[in-house]
Amino acid sequence: EVENLLGRHVGVSRLEGNEADLDVLQQLVTKGVLAKDDVRDWQAVGVVFGDILANELGLAWVSYEDERGVSKALRWRKTMNFVFPITLFSKRNQFNQSIDMHAIYAKLVKDVEAFRAPFHLR
């Protein structure tokens, strides 16, 4: 879905799956390609963003279950440290928060570094 939108609106036919894709995803936001209420497309962007996090930071997609149900999340190793990228942008949009792909990515990198700190890994 996202690659189709990127092809039509940004002129990019393929994503790399790494940090370089953040500029391309930001163009979707900046150009207003996604409708504010289009939760599905915003969540698709979250999946692509999550794939970038997984590839760059060594996280793995898992099913996370709590009292509210099951959702997909990224986990670092077999710890209880999770990131929930799928709903990240749809929720920000819902609450009228700005979306800066690089700033969000940088914050999550710091969060993951904090996960790793007790293990003395970077």
Give the location of each predicted region:
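Glutamate identity and glutamate-enriched acidic tracts
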Residues: E1-E3, E16-E19, E56, E65-E67, ...
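A recognition module on extended beta-rich or small alphabeta surfaces enriched in W/G with H and D/E
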Residues: A73-R122
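Detector for Asparagine
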Residues: N4, N18, N55, N81, ...
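Residue-level signal for functionally critical sites in structured catalytic/ligand-binding pockets
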Residues: Q26, G50-D51, H102-I104
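A sequence-level detector of short, solvent-exposed, charge-rich linear segments
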Residues: R14-D21, A44, R68-K72, L108
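Generic structural signal for hydrophobic core residues of well-folded globular domains
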Residues: H9, V29-G32, E56-L57, R92-N96
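Amphipathic, interaction-prone secondary-structure segments
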Residues: G32-K78
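N-terminal low-complexity, intrinsically disordered segments
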Residues: E1-V39
